[in-house]
């Protein structure tokens, strides 16, 4: 099932200036394609949104469709998504480093040179940070 959300048209009434297409490539694994009309080349430019970008667009599509339409109509969706994902990743990195700094088990693994255990604990702390900050990711 592919859903498409179109922006209001600009000069040509039969042509949407921006639109987003939902693509399901595996069960529970969505990706989105964002199309933006390039008037210089007279064709659409396409961006594929996956992972965090797709998660944010999915949230907007099903929880805040009016805001999604506003972003599409203003042709700001792609820049909005990139800005939110960058801010989220920066916050997750910062929170992960704070968690790692206070983790005694990680410090011990580092002193003993057990890099496999250190990497596993770091991934675990990153996952904790992502879970802690997920709600702020969706706040508009």
Where are these regions (language model features)?
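Short runs of predominantly hydrophobic/aromatic residues within well-ordered alpha helices
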Residues: 53-56, 81, 85, 122-126, ...
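Extracellular/luminal domains of secretory-pathway glycoproteins
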Residues: 2, 16, 20, 25, ...
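Extended, Lys/Arg-enriched charged tracts that mediate electrostatic binding to polyanionic substrates
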Residues: 3-5, 9-14
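C-terminal charged interaction modules
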Residues: 101-140
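Aromatic-anchored, charged helix-turn/loop surface patch used as a conserved interaction hotspot
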Residues: 60-62, 66-114
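Short N-terminal mixed-charge amphipathic segments
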Residues: 22-77
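N-terminal leader/targeting segments
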Residues: 14-15, 57
């Amino acid at each position: 099932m592919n859903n498409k959300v179109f922006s209001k048209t600009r000069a040509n009434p039969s042509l949407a200036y921006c639109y987003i297409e939902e693509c399901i490539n595996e069960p529970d694994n969505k990706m989105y394609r964002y199309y933006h009309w390039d008037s210089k080349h007279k064709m659409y430019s396409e961006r594929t949104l996956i992972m965090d970008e797709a998660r944010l667009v999915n949230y907007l599509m099903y929880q805040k469709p009016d805001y999604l339409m506003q972003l599409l109509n203003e042709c700001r969706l792609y820049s909005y998504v990139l800005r939110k994902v960058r801010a989220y990743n920066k916050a997750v990195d910062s929170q992960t480093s704070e968690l790692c700094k206070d983790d005694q088990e990680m410090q011990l693994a580092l002193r003993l040179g057990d890099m496999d255990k250190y990497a596993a604990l770091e991934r675990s702390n990153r996952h904790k940070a992502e879970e802690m900050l997920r709600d702020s990711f969706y706040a508009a």
